[in-house]
Amino acid sequence: MGCAASKLDNEDAVRRCKDRRRLMKEAVYARHHLAAAHADYCRSLRITGSALSSFASGEPLSVSDQTPAVFLHTPPPPLSEQSPAKFVPPRFSPSPAPSSVYPPSTSPSVASSKQPSVMSTSSNRRRKQQPKPRLPHILSESSPSSSPRSERSNFMPNLYPSAYQNSTYSATPSHASSVWNWENFYPPSPPDSEFFNRKAQEKKHNSDNRFNDEDTETVRSEYDFFDTRKQKQKQFESMRNQVEEETETEREEVQCSEWEDHDHYSTTSSSDAAEEEEEDDDRESISEVGTRSEFGSTVRSNSMRRHHQQPSPMPQVYGGAEQSKYDKADDATISSGSYRGGGDIADMKMVVRHRDLKEIIDAIKENFDKAAASGEQVSQMLELGRAELDRSFSQLKKTVIHSSSLLSNLSSTWTSKPPLAVKYRIDTTALDQPNSSKSLCSTLDRLLAWEKKLYEEIKAREGFKIEHEKKLSQLQSQEYKGEDEAKLDKTKASITRLQSLIIVTSQAVTTTSTAIIRLRDTDLVPQLVELCHGFMYMWKSMHQYHETQNSIVEQVRGLINRSGKGESTSELHRQATRDLESAVSSWHSSFSSLIKFQRDFIHSVHAWFKLTLLPVCQEDAANHHKEPLDAYAFCDEWKLALDRIPDTVASEAIKSFINVVHVISAKQADEHKIKKRTESASKELEKKASSVRNLERKYYQSYSMVGVGLPESGPDNQHMLDARDPLSDKKSELAVCQRRVEEEMVKYSKAIEVTRAMTLNNLQTGLPGVFQSLTSFSALFMESLQTVCTRSYSIK
C-alpha cells in the first residue's frame, strides 16, 4: 500500500492538483491576514495621530517668527466640476442649512482652514437661476390644482413671500410619502377670519417691500435680466397679479402648515424630478469662466445677493492672508491663490503658518485621519465590517417559532412573546444568481472547495488508472500462463469496471476543472482588478495626505522653547509619551504586515493562476484561450510591482522614529527618577529639621537659644556659645542633608533642561524623516500600481 500511495502521489496531475490546493489555501490564509493587517494599519494611523496630539499638548514648544511659512498644494477639483473649456459653478441647494447651501471644500492641510472656493461669474451673463422651491408630494406639481406656482414665477421664486414659503413640512416618513399617515396626524383647530385678513395684509406689505429691494438690487447687480424700465415694470406687474391670483389657492393648500407657524418647508420631491431639475440647472448655469479666489467659512443666505455683490479680483493674484482658526488657534495664517488659464483651475496654493507644536501636530493628525478614511473602500473589498457579515446571511431564510403559531420570515418583534426557537434554512436559489454581488472572500472559499474536490477526483482517477494497469498486466500474465477461462473472465470484468470508473472520474475532473476556470475568469479576475484599483486609489490619496504632512512638518525645524524656566514632565505627559511609543510601534508592525501579506496573497494567487493555465486533462488543452493569459500577465505585473517596492526604507523610517520616542521616554524616566530622589531627600531634610526643632524645644524652650549658653553660665552673666552643645551632631547631619538636597535640586533642574533639549532635537531630526519616507514610498507604490492597473485594461 505504501508503494502504491507513493506512486500515486508522484503522478504529475496529482502533484499539480495538490500544489493548487495548497496555494489556494495559502491565498485564503493570506487574504484573511491581509484584511486584518489593512484594518490594523488604518486604525494605527488614527491612533498615531491621536497619540501625537496628546504628546504635543504637553510640550511648550513654539514656532519662531523667523520660520518660513509652508506652501500647500490643494488637490484639483473633481472631474465632475470641470470641463475642457468651461467651469460649471456649484449648484445651490434650497436647504437653509449653511453647510448644504454652499458647502466649502476642505483642504487636506489643517483642520479648520477651508480651501478657497472658486466660482464662475460673468459680467455679461445672467445670474445662475436659483432652484425652484420644492413642495411636498401632496402639494407638488403632479396635481394640476395643487401647484401654487406657474411659469411666470421662475424669475425669482423667493421674491414674494407666500404661504407655502413660510410653511414647513417636517421630513418624517408620513409626510414624505405620497399618502400621509392620517392616523398619526392631529390637525389643530382652524383659524378664524382675522387670521386670513392679517396674512393678506402682510403679503401685500411684503410684496411692496420686495419690489423696492429688488429694484435696488437689480441696479447694483452685474446680472441684469432686462435692460429697460418698461420690461421690469411688466414683469413686476405680472408677478403682482400672480400673487393675488394664488392667494386663495395657497390658503387652502398649505393651510395646515400655516396653522403651525412654520418658517420653511422640506423637500420631498422624487429623485427623478430632482435629477431633471439639476440637469436643467446645469444647462442654464454654464457661462464664461471668471475665476475668483476667496477664503473663509462663509454662510450664504437664501438670496444670492451677497455672493454677486463682491467683484472678481484680477487673475494670477494671490489673495491676502486672512486669519483662520485651527483648534482655537486664531493666528494660524493661511493665504490662498489661484490663476485662470483657458478657463481651468490650473493651480491652487495655500500658505500655512502655525504657532506651536500643538497646531502642527493637529494638522498632521487631521491628515492621518483622512489617510485612514481613504482605506475604507479597500476594507469593504476585503470584507471588513458588519455589513459584509450580514450579506453572508442573506441567503438564509429565517423561521421564528412561537407558542401559538408558526410565523415564516417574520421578525420576533412582531409579537410580545419571545420565540421558542429560531431556525435557519439555506435558500439554494439565491446562492449563485448571475446578478448577485460576490465578494473576494467567498470566491476564494469556493475556489478552495473546488480545488479540494478536484484533488480528490484526480487522486481517485489516477488510482483507478494505476489499478487498471495492474489488471492489464495480470490479464496478460494469465493469458501467457494459459489459466482457465473463469479467472480470465473475472479479470476482464475488473478491467471493464475500472474503465467505467476512469471514464466517470475523468468526466468529474473535467466538470470540476471547468467550474474552477469559469469561477476564476468571471469572479476572481474582476475582483482582483477591482482590488488593485482600490489599492492604487488608496495609496494615491495617502500620498496626497503624506505630502501635505511632509510640508507641514517642516515647521518643526523652527521650534523653540519660549518658556524661560524648564517645566518638569508631568505623569500625564510621560504616559502620553509611552502611548506614543506604543502607537508608533503598532503602526510599524501593521505597515510591515500590510506589505507582507499583500505580497503573500499575490504570490499565492499568481502561482495558483500559473498552474491553472496547464490543463488537468489532455482533452482540455485546446480549450485554453487568450483571456487567462492576459489575466495572468496582470497578476505577474502585480507580483513584480510588489517585489520592487522599497518598503524597507519606509519601515526603517518608522522604526527610527520609535527609537526617537523611546529616547525621549527614557530621558523622561531619568528625570522622574531624579525627581523622586529629590523629593526623598527633601522629605528626609524636613524630617531631620523637625527632629532638631523638637530637641531645641526640649533643651532650650526657644528657637533663638540654639548654640547659646544658658543664663548665668559665664562671667558677668554674659551669654556665650556652648562648646558642649548636645545638638551639634544633629545640626551637622542637617547641614549635610541640606547640601545633598541642593545638589539633587541642581541635578533635577539639569535633567529637566536635558529632557526639553532632547525632545526638541529629536522631534526636529526624527519627525520630518518619517513623512519624507512615507511620501516617497506612497508615490512609488502609487506609480507601480498605476502600471498594474494599466495592464488590467487589456483583460477582455
Curated annotation (Swiss-Prot):
Interacts with NLP7. InterPro entries: DUF630, DUF632. Residues 273-283 have a biased composition (Acidic residues). One of its GO terms (cellular component) is nucleus. Keywords: Coiled coil, Nucleus, Transcription, Transcription regulation. This is Nitrate regulatory gene2 protein. Residues 98-118 have a biased composition (Low complexity). It is found in: Nucleus. PANTHER family: BZIP DOMAIN CLASS TRANSCRIPTION FACTOR (DUF630 AND DUF632)-RELATED, PROTEIN ALTERED PHOSPHATE STARVATION RESPONSE 1. Residues 163-174 have a biased composition (Polar residues). Residues 124-135 have a biased composition (Basic residues). Disruption phenotype: Under high nitrate concentration, seedlings are slightly smaller and display later flowering than wild-type. Under low nitrate concentration, seedlings appear normal. Nitrate accumulation of the seedlings and roots is significantly lower than in wild-type, however no difference of nitrate accumulation in leaves. Nitrate content differences in roots and leaves may be due to the reduced expression of NPF6.3/NRT1.1 in roots and the increased expression of NPF7.2/NRT1.8 in leaves. Transmembrane segments: none annotated. The lineage of its organism: Eukaryota, Viridiplantae, Streptophyta, Embryophyta, Tracheophyta. Highest expression levels in leaves and roots, and lowest in flowers and siliques. Also expressed in stems and seedlings. Also expressed in stromata. In flowers, expressed in the pistil, junction of filament and anther, and vascular tissue of sepals and petals. In roots, expressed in stelar cells including the pericycle, phloem and parenchyma cells. In leaves, expressed in bundle sheath, phloem and parenchyma cells of the vascular tissue.
